[in-house]
A protein has these predicted regions:
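Soluble catalytic domains of enzymes that build or remodel membrane lipids, polysaccharides, and related
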Residues: 213-482
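Membrane-embedded alpha-helical bundles of multi-pass enzymes
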Residues: 2-215, 256, 410, 421-424, ...
């Protein structure tokens, strides 16, 4: 007679690497456009469980697999810009995107290694796991040019946790989210170590619920009318010389349909020509709106002669009804500048995209003035940098962000981008006006609610109202430093507990 045996420990360990990969694949479903936020908690819990009883080498592999699943799925839209609009063969675009995801996966790999390397005898500490997660997110958003995408807290924007954003920004949302997931994973093993993380997570959820309805800022003026034209010009046609006049005609026609006394915001590089070449047209449009009690703000490429060298900028300008010019600071690698261009230029079309030789703007630039309001401008993915937005919003009444997400087609990329922009409104207690070429064009209130939105891939004008705001949220005053300090304190507390446990065992 043959007796059945339970699965061996080695077999269970072999299952934990696929479990880590599965956990990573689940996490993007928690973000827009899907928004199944409980999957983020499940993803974190499964990731934490996969590290239980792991060696350091196993932890490194499982963390990397988690990151590969998360980024491989979550930013798969990168290949769309490479292939559809960058002229890169699919046989190259997919591996290049995979290589990018594999590099980003090194951050979760380091997290997993740290969690196991400094784990107490009963397994990884949920406190150290959560604290290190946040600190590595900070590093990922800063290292090289930074890639602050898919932070866990963004998945919670439509939950009670969004009330934490004015207090500690995306960092406090992420810390509470990871504490919750790690506590759930630890509780499944019936470990007492789950208790401190669970208590902190409950405090976070309670604080979010309590502060969600509160207003940290107040109206500075009466509601203002705004109009956001969405030209919906196909990306493969935008930069063709034959489209220049057609593009002018499209925006002139859309703008002519707007009633008087509106702040009109055209999207990023609305005109695919330099501002000095289109000066007469732009000034005429701005003057017409100013005479009607409105103002025009437009994205436009600009150039500036500095000595013998010409510098090119991705800019946004007020043209009538105000004043100001802002040059984009955070440039997109390969899209707006090419690292190691002496080596990479000419290798494949993706390294020679139109307008990929921009110069970054100075951090000392002033905000814009339009219709007697101070406007904080952000171009494209500048809006995903929380500290940049909180800093520039200090003396402003409203946030505006202009973008052209046509690069990413019907993928999840534009939805993730918009979700992050919404949280900037909550962090700063200000309305956010988002003007894009083909979507997502929208008006967002200071609590992150979408007040009005145009469908993607349509040519139309979004009309609405917003309220200029004044005041500062705690996050604007203090930035992310208090939460980073808390994350570090959680790591240190876990190390102290580990040392104390070892001391008791030795004695």
């Amino acid at each position: 007679m043959t007796l059945a045996h339970p699965p061996s420990a080695s077999f269970r360990h072999r299952l934990r690497s696929p479990l880590a990969l599965l956990a990573g694949l689940l996490s993007p479903l928690a973000f827009a456009p899907w928004g199944f936020w409980p999957l983020m908690l499940a993803s974190i819990a499964l990731f934490w469980l996969s590290l239980h009883s792991a060696t350091r080498r196993q932890a490194l592999l499982r963390g990397w697999l988690y990151g590969l699943g998360m980024f491989g799925f979550g930013i798969s839209w990168v290949h769309v810009s490479m292939h559809d609009h960058g002229g890169t063969p699919m046989s190259l675009a997919v591996p290049m995107t995979g290589l990018f995801a594999a590099g980003l996966a090194l951050f979760p790999a380091l997290l997993a290694w740290l969690a196991v390397r400094f784990a107490p005898q009963d397994g990884p500490s949920p406190l150290l796991f959560a604290g290190a997660w946040v600190l590595l997110d900070v590093l990922r958003g800063w290292m090289l040019t930074g890639f602050p995408w898919l932070y866990a807290g963004y998945s919670m924007i439509d939950t009670a946790l969004s009330g934490l954003a004015p207090l500690g920004g995306i960092w406090l949302l992420t810390l509470t989210t990871v504490l919750t997931g790690a506590a759930l994973g630890s509780a499944l093993l019936r470990r007492r170590a789950a208790l401190p993380a669970a208590v902190l997570a409950l405090i976070g959820w309670g604080a979010g619920l309590a502060t969600d309805p509160l207003d940290f800022t107040e109206p500075a003026a009466a509601p203002t009318r705004v109009a956001l034209p969405q030209g919906n010009i196909p990306q493969d046609l935008r930069w063709q010389l034959s489209m220049r006049q057609a593009t002018r005609d499209i925006y002139a026609e859309l703008t002519a349909s707007i009633p008087p006394e509106h702040l009109v915001i055209w999207p990023e590089s609305a005109l695919t020509e330099f501002a000095d070449d289109a000066a007469d047209f732009l000034l005429a449009q701005g003057q017409s709106l100013a005479e009607q009690g409105g103002a025009l703000i437009s994205g436009i490429p600009t150039r500036e002669q500095r000595g013998l060298q010409t510098h090119y900028f991705n800019s946004i300008a007020v043209l009538g009804g105000g004043e100001g010019l802002y040059h984009k600071q955070k440039l997109v690698p390969f899209g707006e500048f090419v690292p190691l261009q002496s080596v990479l230029r000419g290798l494949i079309p993706f390294f020679d995209l139109p307008m990929s030789s921009f110069t970054p703007g100075s951090p000392e630039q002033l905000n814009l003035l339009a219709m007697y309001m101070v406007v904080s401008p952000f171009i494209c993915y500048e809006i995903v940098y929380p500290e940049l937005v909180a800093d520039r919003a200090q003396d402003s009444n409203v946030l505006i962000t202009i973008s052209n997400d046509a690069w990413f087609g019907t993928s999840a990329g534009p939805h993730q981008h918009f979700q992050m922009a919404r949280l900037r409104a909550v962090e700063t207690g200000r309305w956010l006006l988002r003007s894009t070429n083909n979507g997502i064009t929208a008006i967002v209130d200071p609590h992150g609610a979408v007040v009005a939105q145009l469908p993607q891939f349509t040519r139309d004008v979004l009309l609405g109202e917003f309220v200029p705001m004044t005041g500062h949220t705690p996050y604007m005053r203090l930035g992310g430093t208090p939460v980073w300090g808390l994350a570090l304190a959680l790591c240190l507390s876990a190390l102290v507990r580990r040392a104390a446990t070892r001391a008791r065992v030795d004695h």
